[in-house]
Amino acid sequence: MLEEIKYKLKRKLFRQMEAYDITLDELKEKQMKGAEIIDVRNKREYDESHILGSINVPEYQINESFEKIVPNKNKEIVVYCSSGFRSASAYRRLRCLGYMNVWNLYGGLENY
């Protein structure tokens, strides 16, 4: 247990907030304005808990299925995972697919 706490703390210390990261308050604001909230964790994690109204698209499936789920590349999208690492990767993938209004929930569900 102590090792897990040390590991999580170390990850948080070395993960700096990026320009594409948003806070919990910003997420709530974007959600109220109709942004798509995408949980990029696996289905088991999503089934255990998730942000109300979010859609589950595991990070490893983004390239193959995301354009069918959200065809509008101008739609505002917020991605999240447990801690912010997988969602940061999902953010980069979505940008490569042409989605321009993408944001990452800083710290993921750990901060929710």
Give names to the regions the model predicted.
Residues M1-E48:
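Flexible, polar/low-complexity N-terminal or interdomain linker segments that lie immediately upstream
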Residues D21, I37, S54-N56, V102-N104:
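Conserved beta-strand scaffold positions in the cores of enzyme catalytic domains, especially
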Residues E26, Q61-F66:
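Short acidic active-site motifs
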Residues Q31, H50, F66, Y106:
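Short, flexible helix/strand-to-coil boundary loops that buttress conserved ligand/catalytic motifs
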Residues R44-E45, I55-N56, I62-E64:
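Membrane-proximal soluble helical/coiled-coil segments
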Residues H50-L52, G98:
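Short, structured coil segments at secondary-structure junctions
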Residues E67-Y112:
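Catalytic cysteine-centered active loop of the rhodanese-like fold, especially the PTP/DSP P-loop
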